[in-house]
Amino acid sequence: MRDSHLPDGWDVEGPVRAEVFMVWLNGERLELTGPDGAAPWILQLADSEHPVEAVDRIVSGLVGPPLLVHSTSWRRDRAAVILSFVAVIGPEQASGMASAPIPRAELARSDATRAPASIGHSQVLEHGLRHLAWLAQDDEVVAERLTGAWQDALAAYVPEPFRSLG
């Protein structure tokens, strides 16, 4: 995948996958859903695809346009780079797919210069929701999309500082 924002000589080669957490608000409770049930959805991205556009297109094809698609983190897993996304959908879009409440999880912690030894899906989603909570307060576009009950549901997700430097 060639990124036109990188200087010559810098390139991303090898498989890139999108890990999509489809999240919706069931009353006051955040839930995870998707075509494979309450689990992340793994998509192989083509070299020519922009990851955000690809996730938006694929989610739209499955359930209709999402309220929001945002990349929240990345990691290397075996031979691929995994880009994690939270795709926010409405309740009507979640109908017909298995869904489950999202439990809280401890964040995966790393050293100052190394990635965590292991990262679970629940930790990735926890990080993603904390990221979304921060954006809902700090980013005009996200704040316009995630109003009222979304703001209330995300209020408990507080970003934490990077502990390895303090």
Task: Mark where each language-model region is.
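Nudix hydrolase/Nudix homology domain
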Residues: 33-43, 75-166
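A short coil-to-beta-strand element that immediately follows conserved catalytic motifs
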Residues: 62-73
